Each structure stands twice: as structure tokens, then as C-alpha cells.
């Protein structure tokens, strides 16, 4: 039996419409399933654990955005229970890395016909991440964008976030320790990635792989504020590695230290001074 964990608010209610499509298709195929709804942050993790403990579940399916997929993944870590993803959020970034379909019934077809395969999960201090973490200009823009979404919709919050991010930009001074080697610099962007995309499809780590047993570190050096508008479009188009002032490394462990930094962890912002990243190879089973 498949358990579908649905976040009703995902995609401004789009997840509920997808739920009806999934119910109809599962009924048409005469396949046993159950649907449960999340009602608070972290609830999807609890529901995933309950599905595993039930002893009757053969797979747990996330119906929501990247946040729902991440929470469900946390509940399935190292259990062998496979995760399926039916995208229903606004970003749906992780599915792009692993090549999953965006259309709901096509995603369901993958779940019903493909054998699960292992993917890596990132470790960060005492928590996990599935996709991308980082600090710098992009996180500043994300913070302003999230604030703008409280009073406007569509593309306007992103435009407001970008303009305010440029207006208030300051370089982030970061000390890195990468596989034992330490250096310091002022950065525009510092991203640690298991996946390739963030922010609704921006390829911040375009060469990352979710099943290579490594993390990708992309660092864009600090540039003066007046130059930022010239780099925004190439960044949005996924050309970050084309900049001569961008460095890219693959590694097993990364430590970054920057007092008072804001860290993006799979789309959520957390204040901290120090972050230690590791990779957990093949820790999650995924239909893909």
C-alpha cells in the first residue's frame, strides 16, 4: 500500500487538486492507498514515520513542494522505505536534479513502474538537508522575497526581493574548511549542494549530482554593489560557473564560519555562526 502525504497549502491549494487526480488514477488501477494531510511544520516527518511503523506501507509519497519532500525524507532516512515525489509546490527544485516529471500523473507513473534507487542526503550540524544550502547575496534576496510575499503575489515579490537585496548588499566574510584545507574570503554567494537547483529553477550548482557521494561547493567572490545588476541575469540563467571569479569544488565535508550569517537550508533561513556539512551517501531510497 502506498501512503500519500499531502500538504494542503502547497502551491496555494494546488496540492488538493492533484490529490483528487491521484485518487482517481489509483482507483482506476485498483491499487490500495491512503491519503493523509499535514497540518503543521514537521508533521510530514511524523506521518512518514507512522507509515513506516504501520508495517503495511510499501512506499511513502510526498504531494507538495520541496519542503514537504524534505520532511517526508527525514522520516524515511535509513529505513529502506522508498520515497516518491509528486510535485505540487511553487519551486519543486529537487525533482529537476533527479529528472522526475513535473506533471502529477507522469510522476505517479514513475512511482508505480520504476524501482527505487539510493540518493545522497546532506548532513548539517544536527540536522539534514536534501537540496541546497548557502549564505550570501542570494539568501538576502530570499529573505526580502519571503517578506514581500506577505502582501503581494506573482513575480512582484521576486522583483522586490532582488531590488532590496541589491540595495542592502554587503559581502559575507566566510572561513571555509574543505576536506581539511582552510581559507578565508569575502563572498557574494556560497552554496553547498546535493542538488543543482534552488529558487524555483535557478541552477546554482549546475554540475551537482544527488548520487555521487559528494557535496558541491560553489563560491562566487565579492563584487561591488554597482556591479551586481550585470551578474543577476547570468546567475538566473544558470551560468554561475562561467564567471572567472567563481570556484567549484566537490568534497565530502565542508565547514563554514561567519559570525551572524543567515543560512538558507532547503529554502528556509536560519541564523547561525558555524555550519558543518557532511554527505550521507545513499541514505535515502527514491523512486526515480
Q: Where do the language-model regions lie?
A:
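ATP/NTP phosphate-donor binding region
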Residues: 1-60
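Catalytic core of DAGKc-family lipid kinases
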Residues: 3, 29, 78-82, 88-188
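ATP/nucleoside-binding phosphotransfer catalytic cores, i.e., glycine-rich phosphate-binding loops
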Residues: 15, 178, 184, 209, ...
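N-terminal glycine-rich "phosphate-gripper" loop used for MgATP/nucleotide binding
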Residues: 62-67
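Short Gly/Thr/Asp-enriched flexible loops that form oxyanion-binding sites at enzyme active sites
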Residues: 68-81
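Glycine-rich phosphate/pyrophosphate-binding beta-alpha loops
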Residues: 134, 138, 191-204, 269
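Gly/Ser/Thr-rich active-site loops/lids in small-molecule metabolic enzymes
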Residues: 149-157, 201, 206-227
Amino acid at each position: 500500500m502506498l501512503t500519500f502525504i499531502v500538504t494542503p497549502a502547497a502551491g496555494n491549494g494546488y496540492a488538493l487538486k492533484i490529490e483528487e487526480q491521484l485518487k482517481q488514477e489509483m482507483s482506476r488501477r485498483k491499487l490500495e492507498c491512503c491519503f493523509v494531510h499535514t497540518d503543521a511544520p514537521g508533521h510530514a516527518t511524523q506521518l512518514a514515520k507512522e507509515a513506516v511503523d504501520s508495517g503495511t506501507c510499501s512506499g511513502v509519497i510526498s504531494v507538495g513542494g520541496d519542503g514537504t519532500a524534505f520532511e517526508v525524507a527525514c522520516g524515511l532516512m535509513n529505513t529502506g522505505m522508498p520515497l516518491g515525489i509528486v510535485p505540487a509546490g511553487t519551486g519543486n527544485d529537487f525533482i529537476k536534479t533527479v529528472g522526475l516529471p513535473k506533471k502529477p500523473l507522469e510522476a505517479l507513473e514513475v512511482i508505480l513502474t520504476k524501482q527505487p534507487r539510493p540518493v545522497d542526503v546532506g548532513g548539517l550540524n544536527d540536522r539534514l538537508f536534501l537540496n541546497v544550502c548557502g549564505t550570501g547575496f542570494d539568501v538576502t534576496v530570499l529573505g526580502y522575497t519571503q517578506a514581500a510575499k506577505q502582501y503581494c503575489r506573482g513575480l512582484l515579490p521576486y522583483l522586490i526581493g532582488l531590488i532590496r537585496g541589491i540595495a542592502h548588499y554587503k559581502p559575507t566574510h566566510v572561513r571555509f574548511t574543505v576536506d581539511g584545507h582552510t581559507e578565508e574570503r569575502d563572498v557574494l554567494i556560497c552554496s553547498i549542494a546535493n542538488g543543482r537547483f534552488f529558487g524555483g529553477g535557478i541552477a546554482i550548482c549546475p554540475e551537482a549530482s544527488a548520487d555521487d557521494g559528494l557535496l558541491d561547493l560553489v563560491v562566487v567572490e565579492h563584487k561591488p554593489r554597482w556591479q551586481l545588476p550585470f551578474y543577476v541575469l547570468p546567475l538566473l540563467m544558470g551560468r554561475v560557473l562561467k564567471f572567472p571569479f567563481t570556484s567549484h569544488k566537490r568534497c565530502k565535508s565542508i565547514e563554514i564560519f561567519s559570525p551572524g550569517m543567515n543560512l538558507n537550508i532547503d529554502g528556509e533561513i536560519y541564523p547561525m555562526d558555524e555550519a558543518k556539512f557532511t554527505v550521507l551517501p545513499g541514505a535515502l531510497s527514491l523512486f526515480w
